[in-house]
Amino acid sequence: MSYVLFATLGLLPSFAWLLFFLREDIHPEPKKLIAKVFFYGALVTVVATGFQFLFRYGLGLVAIGQYAFVSFLIFGTIEEVLKFAVAYKAVSKSSYFDEPVDAMIYMIAAGLGFAVVENIFVMFSIEALGVALGVIVLRFVGATLLHALSSALVGYYWALSLIKARKKELIIGLASASLLHALFNYLIMKTGNAMFYPVIFLIIVAFFVFWDFEQMKTRSE
């Protein structure tokens, strides 16, 4: 197995979605700042994994049976809070962070950075190239898109919280993104890893998130 090839496959879904959203930005953000947030998002994956390990094994909380949804909700919350934390740390005081849509763009960059590490780990667990290609396509429309959408949702409410100068919207955004994360993973578990229903679910969510994105673009004109 070529680790370089499989690592490249792991990078592609995140880069593709990032390019898509960046092309939609009316006033493009500095590439160095986008790269910084993307890197921070990737780096925080290690922290999230540590917290999830603590909850799963240290507290005996496992994502099976009657506790499955609660487990997924806790794990999703950990990821969404950490992605927001690194994006906030990286850009909140930057002079380039000056438009409502910027909050969504930078959150998407953090989310896709997070997703790229997950994808590479998954690729390294596969030996056959044909299988890896099939899996990465599914992750492009599945887990990677999930991270983009959930992070965009946080970014939308982050922007609203800044516009309205109150924290309630940000809390709503983090809660909504965590719930989205949990519902997606729960659907996968319930459908026996069949991706049809989870992907349809994400497509429906995407319509609403893209509408939010257009709203913030309008506010940024």
Report each predicted region and the residues it spans:
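Hydrophobic alpha-helical segments at protein termini of multi-pass membrane proteins
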Residues: 1-221
